[in-house]
């Protein structure tokens, strides 16, 4: 009985009595030195056919057979890979007509002279023209395959099934067409697939084989089902793109089928090579293709966004393939699933959003600059600072604003650089800063809205062109608003009263700030005058003289305010220091008094405790039983104890201790009177 395994290359057949044959390997091998007398050699379609009796082979011959067959299989695979590679190169290198004829395997046996019909095998193997869209889809299929193979369950399906290692000898009886992701990758890289549909069919076959052989609930079944769903969700996007390309590919397929039985003369074929032009080859190269680096950069830019605009969210929802696994507040999208056209649209939307963010950041963001501990007031344009003075300034965003203050603080952009260690003035500005101000509501006082560039006449930094001065804008915009310099001059008393209401530290900061930027304010107003060269020179000269006079007055007033604020601050600091010293002294006296009271209470408690102890000892001596006490002392301490010499005898124990009651003098005087008279010896017979 001979059996034939169609899965073996070379069309080998072998005898297996009773249907038993070696399934120890995926592909049997033949050894060159094996002595098989029953070997039969035939030929089918030009391929040799041999029948090998497995029952008559020894173990060494079988091993040699396996080795030989594996070697031949490897040679066939290498040949197939080279053939497919040459076909792919021939397809992509055709530039005249876009139609390339490739000789199939064994085609040299057929002749295609004039009047000869084309061999159906060679006609069927003639490839259809591959367009740019199909090539891009195949690249996306390759990316999807990489994701499948790198999945946590992909390792099970990355290699062919080893029936010997897994001990599943009946696998090829159940599964007629084995397939794995590794084989799919090899076929994809070698160009075997002519369209993405063939790729999808092999991927589905891989998972369906695993689900067919393994029962539901098995680990491999669950893994295959998970990967199948993973693939189907992402294949929907590619399938939509593929449906658009089928319109162009189907006519070429029909022409290929018609050419199977058509007589093709050689001269006509040469004419087609030189004259035929494929319209798709002209249109497709114009399409933009996004590279992998651009895709990666696009993904990083999307991840870096904290807020998404509405148009970007709508675009992502429209192109989202995972419709079932998302919520209202979450969108999951794969960059590799999107087409190049969609990716470029997404890139444009993202660039537009980033430009809007950059414009917002580059716009004027005013912030107040306050001075904690300013230096001596003076001309800011002549003051130079070192690195230590930079610590005296802080930026106040407006949280500690004075609600009723008439002071108009000058605000500067956040990117303003205030001085440096090279000796630039704190009043000067490096680069091209713009001056602006926060609109504040104050009684009868306008604010400064300056946006001119500072030139280098007063400060040490270079400047560029500037706009119209803010004071002129205020005068033209509203007649009720006046310049800050004139308002300060006219309302000196009001500002002084308001500053008195402020804390000394706040007043000092405001005065130093105004004094520091006085030159900048006046210079900003003077610059528009220098730009208006078309005006009357005499009028310009008068305005300059007025500005110089106002500048001198303003400087004098600001210096006086700064000095007054400095003096007030010093007085406040001295008063606060005196109050702090007095408070510390008072606290020290209170602590000392509390310590003395605690010491006295402690001494009194100690004396009372000692007197109570003495009284308890005396009471014990008065109430103790002398006989019992002496007996216990003799038993415990022995005869050498000093207390044994005391004989209590029933007398007062205090007298035994040497304590006696002292009698008063009155009692001593009364003793002779009460004492009995001395006895007189009376002789017998004598009458008294």
UniProtKB/Swiss-Prot annotation:
Interacts with BT1. Residues 132-238 form the Bromo domain. It is found in: Nucleus. This is Transcription factor GTE9. Residues 1-36, 423-505, 660-688 are annotated as: Disordered. Keywords: Activator, Bromodomain, Coiled coil, Nucleus, Phosphoprotein, Transcription, Transcription regulation. The modification Phosphoserine is found at residue 478. GO terms for cellular component: nucleus. PROSITE patterns: BROMODOMAIN_2, NET. It comes from Arabidopsis thaliana. Residues 534-613 form a coiled coil. Transmembrane segments: none annotated. Residues 280-361 form the NET domain. Residues 491-500 have a biased composition (Polar residues). It comes from the Eukaryota. The keyword Transcription regulation applies. Residues 505-688 are annotated as: Transcription activation domain. Pfam families: BET, Bromodomain. InterPro entries: Bromodomain, Bromodomain-like_sf, Env_Response_Regulator, GTE_bromo, NET_dom, NET_sf. Its main location: nucleus.
